[in-house]
Amino acid sequence: MSGYTGNNYSRYSSTPPRQRGGYHHARRSRGGAGGSYYRGGNASYGARYNSDYEQPPQEGDLRQTGAYYRNGYTDTRPYYSANSRHYQAQPSPRYNNGTNSYHLPQRGNSQDTNGRTTSASQEDNDEKRVKSRYRNMQADHPRQQPMSVGSTSSRNGSSGNSSTSSTSNGLPPPPSVSSITNNRSYHSSAYPYSSSHTYNNYHHRETPPPPPSNGYYAKGYPVHVPENRSNSDGSSSSVVKKKRILDMKDSPFIYLTDFDKNVKKTNNTESECEKAREVFKESDSIDSALEELNLKINSNELELRLLNNQCDKHALNIQLTQEKLDSLLLMQ
């Protein structure tokens, strides 16, 4: 970060350290020794950085933390692990010497950070330079709102000259779509989100697959029984009932054995069916007689068990009386 605004917060956060989970910096320097922990004093900051803590944000200078933190960018913190160190926002000469600075694309001649004049022919060279870390701020944070107009102020360089911005609110034009998609952001591997990350995919649900067809289920009956329909003649529209050869009062064995279907349709069909009826009637009578005999056998078996139990009871009574007699004989 090039500007030291005095908030003494971490590099990417606008929230004070005491409000971020109770985290405290190891050594927080105040007053004229601002930045002495990491750099070693106020002397190396240059003419622009003095002990004034409330410097106004420089016009068009996106490297200043105050320009973002004082205008609505309240959640620019990337993901930090639990034990990672939060370094203070310290200015460094590699962000001040102009090699890594963000130059405003202007039509006419203007002065950059160090007072050098740049013309319109140098715009291509400016694009080829190393992009600042906040060049793709909108790509890293697509939900953030643009900065307000109130952040514009006069910019005093080291030579005392002032430069005016090409836009009304003192900000450069937003990066193009090609620069967002083609250029890799500064947080290439450390930042958890990609440059084209959107935040509505949390509740994203894929469409369920279509239900399987009826032929998918090999076992079981289909839901709709297929009907064979032929539109060749009009008589097929009416349901044709198949007339059974045998009546329902006949023996069920006829239908279980499909005897009525196996009978050949000849002139003596009725005689064959009559013979089959007589045979099945005889078999039914025989089955009923067998059932009666089976019932008699079961009843006789129960009677035998009862008699056996009675015999056991009588045997116990005889043994008891014999013991009583023996006891009486011993007493005499």
Curated annotation (Swiss-Prot):
One of its GO terms (molecular function) is molecular condensate scaffold activity. It holds the Pfam family Lge1. Residues 1-17, 81-122 have a biased composition (Polar residues). This is Transcriptional regulatory protein LGE1. The gene is LGE1. Residues 284-328 form a coiled coil. GO terms for biological process: chromatin organization; premeiotic DNA replication; regulation of cell size. Keywords: Activator, Chromatin regulator, Coiled coil, Methylation, Nucleus, Transcription, Transcription regulation. It comes from Saccharomyces cerevisiae (strain ATCC 204508 / S288c). Residues 39-49, 148-170, 185-199 have a biased composition (Low complexity).
